[in-house]
């Protein structure tokens, strides 16, 4: 039976330039996700960059010989605290899938680059990354990183590497260029979740493919629909939002000064 395609991304639909981000470093954007103008495709940037120094976008779309790439451009990931820039795709219900992606790093002196999987959110996921001249499979929880397994790997800036992670229940098999490096069992894989490209150094991603079986795809849809029905049932027990008052600000913004008490 043919694999069911969850994601088939080569970034060709993206215009050359910046992936959407909060260019104004707004107060709202500091605490909330805002859908900024621009093309997102099937991707979401869950890691805001608020260093207020005009550093620009975390991610850009570049082109070489007619092929598009998604590039990570953020070279500081320690302010205001340790962060892991990433783009995610999919949802929390994805599970038992295979992710394959290409990555080329533009420095080997520091930082990491690779793929994420079983992402419940940007602070709870598994990653397969190159770092400190090793290939590592890690569990990230908030700022803490647990190395589940590692092996020496002499990577460079000239080659493009094909990373692959196959997840089935708690079983994870990780490969680079069709060579298996890790075959582990971990409870962190059972949760399933989104996929990601992630890097703390300038790095270039050429494609991301995610596949699963037809039966698993059907069970993913069933779980998603069941959760939606559960939420709608819970919401039905509470009163709906009702407009009580409108205030004309005469063209002025609210900044941080307008609170519910003012209404």
Q: What are the language-model segments listed below?
A:
Residues 3-8, 96-100, 104, 160-162, ...:
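Intrinsic-disorder/low-complexity, polar/charged segments enriched in Ser/Thr/Lys/Arg/Asp/Glu/Gln
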Residues 141-162:
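Short, aromatic/His-centered strand-loop micro-motif at the edge of beta-sheets
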Residues 1-52, 217-253, 260:
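Extracellular carbohydrate-recognition regions
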Residues 184-209:
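Flexible glycan-contacting loops in extracellular carbohydrate-active proteins
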Residues 85-91, 149-155, 195:
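Beta-strand-rich interaction surfaces with strong enrichment in secreted/lumenal proteins
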Residues 40-82, 244-245:
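Short carbohydrate-recognition loop motifs
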Residues 11, 101, 157-185:
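Carbohydrate-binding surfaces in secreted/extracellular proteins
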Residues 65-141, 251-255, 260-262:
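Secretory/extracellular carbohydrate-interaction modules
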